[in-house]
Amino acid sequence: MILLLATAGACAAGTATTGTFGTGGGGNTANGGGGATSSSQSSTGSDVGGGTFTTSGTGTGGAPPVDFAAYAHTGKALYSIDPMAPSAAPKLIGNFDCIGGTGQDSAMTDLAVNQSGDIWGISDTKIYRLTVEGSVVHCATTITLPNPNAVFYGLTFAPAGILDDSTKEVLVAGNTAGQLWSVDTTNGTLTQHGTFGNVPANDGHGHSYDNKGKAWELSGDIVFLANGGNPVGFAAVRDCPNPPSTSGCNATDTLIAIDMTKLKSVGSQSVTLKVRGQMLKSAGCSGADTAYERMLGIAAWNDKVYGFSHNSAIVEIDNNDGSACLVASTPNVFWNGAGVTTLAPVIKPPE
């Protein structure tokens, strides 16, 4: 899953699933909005794109085709992305019509996509049901959140049966305090379903942490996938000296795996299954940076997690050990989030 604006090298992506991915036409890229702070952005493209990957099922029984929706976004604009084509350019869909105006929040901080391809977004104080209408991303529903004194940076859907015993998927938001909250999409009611726990001495690969024992903070995003009834979850986190304050945090993000069983319980329990590793540059990869941070958007595909950094970089992260390769530099495009359907293929790392 790549947005390639200025090629900076690549790592091989997983190839467990093949198919073709259709997006909208071209269109100019936009200067991204900035995190949860006010910034300007212009978009001149008039294109639309659904970001829909279609693959035919294999094996006996003739499984029907499945649509995989995948997106990335800046503070103010939505793009479709192609998980199967590392060299494919992003396709600008359009600007969010509920962001940046009078009385509106300044930036969309993340989005989530359910198994039906429906898109929901989140900002500092609200959630939105999003629909693509021509070259505009319309906020069809806007619900104000009773914000628990921390900014929401991450959004995903918990697959059916995780937080609800029915076939219903549930929206889950993550905040700077390292807390996960289910979100009622009818009225915005928040219910806590865990935290990321505390920072260990090291990541299991010999890389130590300066803030051992402190609560993990969410660096930017979470992603959950159904995985055929064996759900998988990941988060990009960081260690900070005084959580939930974002000052003085480690300049290297860490990939963690989520215990989807513990997520079901209401409360402040740790739901971290395993620290996969710090996002350090893999041997043989290009790019000047030796570590990666501010992964405000992540989306999983096969054995990789793709990170969209607010530092204008897109990286491919190994979901086993957190090692990372720079895939693209995106000057003047500051990523705020990413989302992929809960039906996206994933190769679960060993526990």
Please give the residue ranges for each predicted region:
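Ser/Thr-rich, Pro/Gly/Ala-heavy low-complexity intrinsically disordered linkers and tails
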Residues: 1-65, 350
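Short loop/turn segments that connect beta-strands within beta-propeller blades
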Residues: 83-86, 131-135, 184-188, 259-264, ...
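Structural motif
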Residues: 75-81, 126-131, 177-184, 241-259, ...
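Blade-level signature of beta-propeller repeat domains, shared across WD40, Kelch, NHL, RCC1
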Residues: 311, 316-351
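Conserved beta-propeller blade signature
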Residues: 68-73, 79, 118-121, 128, ...
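Structural signature of eukaryotic scaffold interfaces centered on beta-propeller domains
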Residues: 59-66, 107-116, 148-169, 211-232, ...
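Beta-propeller fold detector
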Residues: 88-100, 137-147, 190-208, 264-287, ...
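An edge-strand/N-cap motif at the start of beta-rich repeat modules
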Residues: 63-90
